[in-house]
């Protein structure tokens, strides 16, 4: 049977949240009959550059969090900084356009910098199909915004950054239906599966796929509060090695997070991204503690304001907050039955759109000049050379 159209989903392997959202969207769209292509934005870069970009970002997050926070604030308050990023990415627009098949009916992004490439292509008429983005954070930061993007989607409690004026469509979270809260028997089986104690209160400590932030301090302080921590270190082997011992339950990368969330009583997190959306969908109480710089702190504030999590701002607050959350027991799963399924929104847009058609085979003669000028202007703007 002929499929109703092709949809391209663009993500990036910066952490795991962007890819997990893209995976779930692709799953839902395929269930609706669409052909789905997945693109990793960083694969547009030459392989050594791809690795350098990813590892530099990881290094800054781990070793220079103040630098990451400063960049997050700069791009949040300065349109010039966002335009500079867009200009620096301009040389890769054509390469991305050529990766979009002619029968594509819509392009969806789950990574902000993809919008800085696709938005201009759409605005200039080089991409005829709608560009839709799903914001994986609770804060819609200006780096997600680009002229030409048709629809911005975010979960219901998300907030636009103070410098943003975007019109955002509230949608259901892109988390697997497997994130559900079940009964005591499922808890027992889940604990047995992961080798966890059958009795006692367990706190799941998560820090993203890179194990970023003050994880060791968090683990020690959760234990000092009388709650046994279960730590997920993701791909951070060094962190896992450092935390092992003393009867701790320390895991690396976990494929079946729905099962692990059924095994614990509370989650302590520091980033507020997709894992937070998954915990809320599963009805697992969430405590934010020692949030990482940039988006972590911004998400923490929004989650606390919305009443979706409790933010323990100091070590002295952690124990009472954990006791209060655990004392109330499991919470009702945060299922949004009012907002639209993002897959339905994308499917509707794709059915109305004409096919993308072929990418231009000839590069306009002035494009290389424009690329060079844009990059030079971006560099001058970022250093204050243009006023």
What are these regions (language model features)?
Residues 304-307, 313-330, 352:
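C-terminal "capping" alpha-helix adjacent to the active site of nucleotide-linked donor transferases
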Residues 24-99:
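Conserved N-terminal ligand/cofactor-binding loop architecture of enzyme catalytic domains
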Residues 4-45, 104-105, 110, 119, ...:
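Soluble, non-transmembrane catalytic domains of enzymes that act on hydrophobic metabolites at membranes
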Residues 151-201, 207, 234-236:
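A nucleotide-sugar donor-handling region in carbohydrate enzymes
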Residues 257-298:
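A donor-sugar binding/catalytic signature common to diverse glycosyltransferases
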Residues 21, 77-161:
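Active-site and donor-binding regions of nucleotide-sugar-utilizing enzymes
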Residues 327-387:
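C-terminal amphipathic helix plus adjacent low-complexity
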Residues 185-264:
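Donor-nucleotide binding loops and adjacent catalytic segments primarily
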């Amino acid at each position: 049977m002929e499929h109703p159209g092709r949809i391209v989903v663009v993500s990036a392997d910066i952490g795991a949240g962007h890819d997990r959202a893209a995976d779930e969207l692709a799953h839902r769209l395929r269930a609706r009959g669409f052909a789905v292509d997945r693109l990793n934005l960083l694969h547009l870069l030459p392989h050594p550059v791809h690795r350098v970009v990813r590892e530099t970002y990881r290094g800054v997050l781990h070793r220079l969090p103040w630098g990451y926070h400063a960049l997050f604030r700069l791009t949040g308050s300065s349109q010039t900084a966002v335009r500079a990023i867009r200009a620096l990415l301009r040389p890769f627009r054509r390469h991305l356009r050529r990766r979009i098949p002619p029968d594509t009916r819509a392009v969806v992004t789950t990574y902000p910098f993809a919008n800085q490439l696709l938005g201009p292509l759409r605005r200039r008429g080089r991409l005829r199909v709608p560009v839709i983005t799903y914001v994986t954070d609770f804060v819609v930061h200006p780096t997600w915004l680009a002229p030409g993007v048709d629809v911005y989607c975010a979960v219901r409690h998300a907030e636009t950054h103070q410098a943003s004026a975007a019109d955002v469509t509230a949608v259901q979270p892109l988390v697997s239906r497997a994130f559900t809260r079940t009964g005591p028997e499922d808890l027992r089986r889940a604990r047995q599966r992961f080798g966890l104690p059958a009795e006692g209160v367990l706190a799941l400590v998560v820090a993203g796929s890179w194990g970023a932030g003050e994880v060791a301090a968090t683990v020690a302080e959760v234990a000092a509060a009388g709650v046994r921590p279960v730590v997920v270190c993701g791909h951070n082997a060094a962190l896992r090695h450092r935390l092992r011992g003393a009867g701790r339950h320390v895991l690396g990368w976990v494929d079946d997070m729905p099962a692990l969330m059924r095994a614990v009583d509370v989650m302590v997190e520091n980033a507020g991204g997709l894992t937070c959306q998954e915990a809320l969908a599963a009805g697992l109480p969430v405590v934010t503690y020692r949030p990482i710089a940039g988006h972590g702190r911004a998400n923490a504030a929004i989650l606390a304001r919305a009443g979706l999590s409790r933010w323990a701002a100091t070590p002295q607050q952690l124990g009472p907050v954990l006791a209060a959350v655990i004392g109330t027991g499991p919470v009702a799963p945060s299922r949004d039955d009012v907002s639209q399924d993002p897959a339905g929104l994308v499917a509707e847009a794709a059915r109305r759109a004409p096919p993308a058609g072929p990418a231009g085979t000839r590069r306009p003669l002035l494009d290389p000049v424009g690329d060079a000028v844009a990059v030079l202007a971006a560099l001058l703007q970022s250093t204050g050379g243009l006023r």
